[in-house]
Structures are given as structure tokens and as C-alpha cells.
Amino acid sequence: MDVLCEENTSLSSPTNSFMQLNDDTRLYHNDFNSGEANTSDAFNWTVDSENRTNLSCEGCLSPPCFSLLHLQEKNWSALLTAVVIILTIAGNILVIMAVSLEKKLQNATNYFLMSLAIADMLLGFLVMPVSMLTILYGYRWPLPSKLCAVWIYLDVLFSTASIMHLCAISLDRYVAIQNPIHHRRFNSRTKAFLKIIAVWTISVGISMPIPVFGLQDDSKVFKEGSCLLADDNFVLIGSFVSFFIPLTIMVITYFLTIKSLQKEATLCVSDLGTRAKLASFSFLPQSSLSSEKLFQRSIHREPGSYGRRTMQSISNEQKACKVLGIVFFLFVVMWCPFFITNIMAVICKESCNEDVIGALLNVFVWIGYLSSAVNPLVYTLFNKTYRSAFSRYIQCQYKENKKPLQLILVNTIPALAYKSSQLQTGQKENSKQDDKATENDCTMVALGKQHSEDAPADNSNTVNEKVSCV
């Protein structure tokens, strides 16, 4: 933008020139706020009465002029996108740290979640800031044209990697439920990393045609000065291969996993009832010895502990599926509008309004980006280990505080002493009760003898039986 001030004989002082320029600025603001401003003549005003000021802008629809004209409108959207970027980067860094440092979280599913967090973090570092820059420049590409294809490639790569990770997690958990022995045998850390490498390889292969053809032909990635996929074949094939097909696999395997868990829980409950019935059935007489009673009680306890362990494992699986289900649901809800609108833009090119479709795509793509920032919040709300780890990392405490040996002894020894004293008291009470029972038995024996002496001879057998029973 050029500001050309022509001095006149009546405008010799710098103060007057500044005041005149300020008047012209107020004139511009008044016209802009009244809604009469136009992008074609916003910077071509000339005050002809005194020939004081001439504001001109070459190419009024160029990015700098367009950005300056709509600066007041774009501030809020830029602020919101900046918040999304910060949340995405910070939250996913916390997830990566938690899986790397917490031993409780080091399993196959959390390794996939860590790789997913890496993809989301790179999306926040490399893709979202450039997208925010295009918003400030009126959705025009402000960088060198060769970087446009690279930026679209990274966008498609990280978005495809996200859906592929979720699809792989769903498949892995379904295999673990259906064939647990085989899954445990092939579920080492190395095998998990090999699966993650396979996911990234597939994502790179799907998105690689974009830079290959985009760098050769700018028309495939540019449309009216905006950096976007302009080839209809890229849009259709990419939408189905990178989103809809993995989405279908993910949803089907997730619901099959839920169904299998419900079936296992039902079988476990019925099996637990059968074991309890078999254990409660006793072949021993009621007047058995105390050791035999203890043996019977130990048999009765075994199925309960077995059932509790099995039900606990099923409950843990159900909780994990619940958290993953929320992640899947949010990802689908946030990305589906963009991909559906993307396909509509190709199918109904003639009947649909391109301006409306373009505006919807600009909004829906940021809703999809928001899913990368939401995942750490889901882990925080529904997983205690993640929540405690995040709170410690925010306070710069990277290791869990363990109690010193002295505190452990202070906390455990009094409890043990209390339990031992209670045990001794119980033993004393039991011994007193035994002594009383013995005294009663002895008195009964004495009474029996006395009664036998005074009683007739025909009752002697009955008395002797009573004494022997005691």
C-alpha cells in the first residue's frame, strides 16, 4: 500500500499534514463501518478538493490488502485457531511423555496412542500454523508456490495417520479378545512398534501422490490463488481411501469387540454360578472334623477368587473400550462433515454454490483439527493414570513420588502390631471359651456319674452313651 502525500502551499507544516492524514483515516473507518466499503475501491480513494492524500493499492484483491481490509473480522478466528494449536501441541506432548515415562501405560494400545499423539503434535506444529496464516491472508497462499504441495501432503499424511492409528487399535483389540493366546504370544513391544511402522507406511503411501503430481503441475494444488486440492480424482479417491474405508473397518471391529466382551461377561457369570454350586455340594457328613471343614471352605473360596479375577479383567477391557469408543466417536463426528462436504464439492459442482461449499470446508477443516486437541482431554477425564501423570508433569515432577522406607515402616508397623494384638486377644478369648466348655463338660460328666449311681440299672447304658459323646 502506497501513501502519497502531495504538499500544497497551504499545507507546509508537518502537523497539518498529519491531521489531514488522520482525517482521511477516519473517513476510511466511517465508510468501512457503515458497510459501504468495497474490496475493489477500498484503497483507491483520493481527496480531490485539496489534493491532500491519495491512497492506492496495486491489485486490490491481493493478500495484504484483503487481510488489512478484513483484519477486524479475522482477529477472533485467528485467536480461536491459536488456542487450538496451543492445546494440540501441549496436550499431545503430555501424552507422549506419559507413555514414555509411566510403566503402567507401556502396553500395545498405549504405544498406538503415543504414535497417534505424535501425528497430532506434528499436525499442530507444521500444518495448523500455516492454515492460520492463510486465514489472515483471506485464504490466499502467502508462501512460495512450491511449498503448497508440501503443506497439503503433510496435512493429508497426519490426518490419514490419525484414522489409521484408530483403525489399527480397533483391529488389535478385537484380535486380543477373539484369540488371546495368539495375541499374547505376538504382542511384544517390538511387534507393537512394527505395527506402528506399518501404519505410518500406509499413510505415507496414500498421501505420496500429492507432492509427486503437485510439484510438477501447480494447477492440481492451486485454485484461484488458494492452496487446496483442485484435482477431483485426488479428492474422491483420497477421501475414500484415507477416511471412509478405515472408518468402516474401525466401526465394525469396535462393535464386534463390544459384543464379544458382553458374551464373555455372560459366560463368566454363568460359569461362576456353576462352580459355586459344585463347590457348595459336600460329600462329608455334618459331624466332620474341623480340618475337613477348613478344606471344604478352601474349596468354596477358589471359584470366587477365580471369578473375581476373570470379571476384573473383563471390566478392565470394558473400561478401555469405553475410553477408546469416546475417542473414535469424537474423531468421526469432527471429521465426517469435512469429508462429506469435500465429496459434495466434486459431485454437485454445477448445482451447489461454490462459495457456500468453500466456506463450509474452511470451517469444517478446523473442526477436524480440533479432534487432535480433544484426545488428551479424553484421556485426562477417563483414565486415572494419565490424569495423575499430566498433573505431575505440569508441576515439573517427572517421577512419581515414592514414600521413604521410614514412612512405610511408620505406616505399616502400627497396623501389624494392632492386628497381632487383636489376634492374641481373639486367641485368649477362644481359649477362655474352650476352658468354660471343658468345665461344663466335666460338670456334666460328674452329674452323669452321680445320676448313674442313684438311677436304676436299666438306665445305665443311656448315661454311659451321653458321657462318651461328651
UniProtKB/Swiss-Prot annotation:
<dbReference type="GO" id="GO:0098793">
    <property type="term" value="C:presynapse"/>
</dbReference>
<keyword id="KW-0807">Transducer</keyword>
<feature type="topological domain" description="Cytoplasmic">
    <location>
        <begin position="98"/>
        <end position="111"/>
    </location>
</feature>
<dbReference type="GO" id="GO:0030594">
    <property type="term" value="F:neurotransmitter receptor activity"/>
</dbReference>
<feature type="binding site">
    <location>
        <position position="155"/>
    </location>
    <ligand>
        <name>serotonin</name>
    </ligand>
</feature>
<keyword id="KW-0085">Behavior</keyword>
<comment type="similarity">
    <text>Belongs to the G-protein coupled receptor 1 family.</text>
</comment>
<comment type="function">
    <text>G-protein coupled receptor for 5-hydroxytryptamine (serotonin). Also functions as a receptor for various drugs and psychoactive substances, including mescaline, psilocybin, 1-(2,5-dimethoxy-4-iodophenyl)-2-aminopropane (DOI) and lysergic acid diethylamide (LSD). Ligand binding causes a conformation change that triggers signaling via guanine nucleotide-binding proteins (G proteins) and modulates the activity of downstream effectors.</text>
</comment>
<feature type="glycosylation site" description="N-linked (GlcNAc...) asparagine">
    <location>
        <position position="38"/>
    </location>
</feature>
<keyword id="KW-0597">Phosphoprotein</keyword>
<feature type="topological domain" description="Extracellular">
    <location>
        <begin position="138"/>
        <end position="146"/>
    </location>
</feature>
<dbReference type="GO" id="GO:0030424">
    <property type="term" value="C:axon"/>
</dbReference>
<feature type="topological domain" description="Extracellular">
    <location>
        <begin position="1"/>
        <end position="80"/>
    </location>
</feature>
<keyword id="KW-0770">Synapse</keyword>
<feature type="transmembrane region" description="Helical; Name=4">
    <location>
        <begin position="192"/>
        <end position="215"/>
    </location>
</feature>
<dbReference type="InterPro" id="IPR002231">
    <property type="entry name" value="5HT_rcpt"/>
</dbReference>
<dbReference type="GO" id="GO:0007268">
    <property type="term" value="P:chemical synaptic transmission"/>
</dbReference>
<feature type="transmembrane region" description="Helical; Name=1">
    <location>
        <begin position="81"/>
        <end position="97"/>
    </location>
</feature>
<feature type="compositionally biased region" description="Polar residues">
    <location>
        <begin position="458"/>
        <end position="470"/>
    </location>
</feature>
<dbReference type="GO" id="GO:0005886">
    <property type="term" value="C:plasma membrane"/>
</dbReference>
<dbReference type="Pfam" id="PF00001">
    <property type="entry name" value="7tm_1"/>
</dbReference>
<keyword id="KW-0472">Membrane</keyword>
<feature type="disulfide bond">
    <location>
        <begin position="148"/>
        <end position="227"/>
    </location>
</feature>
<dbReference type="GO" id="GO:0004993">
    <property type="term" value="F:G protein-coupled serotonin receptor activity"/>
</dbReference>
<keyword id="KW-0675">Receptor</keyword>
<feature type="topological domain" description="Cytoplasmic">
    <location>
        <begin position="172"/>
        <end position="191"/>
    </location>
</feature>
<dbReference type="GO" id="GO:0031410">
    <property type="term" value="C:cytoplasmic vesicle"/>
</dbReference>
<feature type="short sequence motif" description="PDZ-binding">
    <location>
        <begin position="468"/>
        <end position="470"/>
    </location>
</feature>
<feature type="topological domain" description="Extracellular">
    <location>
        <begin position="348"/>
        <end position="355"/>
    </location>
</feature>
<keyword id="KW-1003">Cell membrane</keyword>
<keyword id="KW-0968">Cytoplasmic vesicle</keyword>
<feature type="transmembrane region" description="Helical; Name=2">
    <location>
        <begin position="112"/>
        <end position="137"/>
    </location>
</feature>
<feature type="binding site">
    <location>
        <position position="342"/>
    </location>
    <ligand>
        <name>serotonin</name>
    </ligand>
</feature>
<dbReference type="InterPro" id="IPR017452">
    <property type="entry name" value="GPCR_Rhodpsn_7TM"/>
</dbReference>
<feature type="region of interest" description="Disordered">
    <location>
        <begin position="448"/>
        <end position="470"/>
    </location>
</feature>
<keyword id="KW-0325">Glycoprotein</keyword>
<keyword id="KW-0812">Transmembrane</keyword>
<dbReference type="GO" id="GO:0030425">
    <property type="term" value="C:dendrite"/>
</dbReference>
<feature type="transmembrane region" description="Helical; Name=3">
    <location>
        <begin position="147"/>
        <end position="171"/>
    </location>
</feature>
<dbReference type="InterPro" id="IPR000276">
    <property type="entry name" value="GPCR_Rhodpsn"/>
</dbReference>
<feature type="topological domain" description="Extracellular">
    <location>
        <begin position="216"/>
        <end position="232"/>
    </location>
</feature>
<feature type="transmembrane region" description="Helical; Name=6">
    <location>
        <begin position="322"/>
        <end position="347"/>
    </location>
</feature>
